[in-house]
């Protein structure tokens, strides 16, 4: 599973404040909230929380893409998320 391999790599580095670790945590929260919202379609507070977390992850990914493009590409491939649109 992708989750276990990413966890082992991140915990080996012991950088819990790193951008990669934060994006990883946000991705897990997003996946949990998405599965919750599939069951509870009218849970508007959870929808709002999901949008906030998506925005935070998007900002962190934009920061990482600007600072280190190679780490950004590796991270989005490991987490199996789409690349952000550039303007």
Curated annotation (Swiss-Prot):
A cellular component annotation (GO) from this entry: ribosome
Pfam families for the chain: Ribosomal_S15
One annotated GO molecular function: structural constituent of ribosome
Keyword terms of this UniProt record: Chloroplast, Plastid, Ribonucleoprotein, Ribosomal protein
PROSITE patterns (alphabetical): RIBOSOMAL_S15
SUPFAM superfamilies recorded: S15/NS1 RNA-binding domain
Transmembrane segments: none
Family: Belongs to the universal ribosomal protein uS15 family.
Protein's name in the database: Small ribosomal subunit protein uS15c
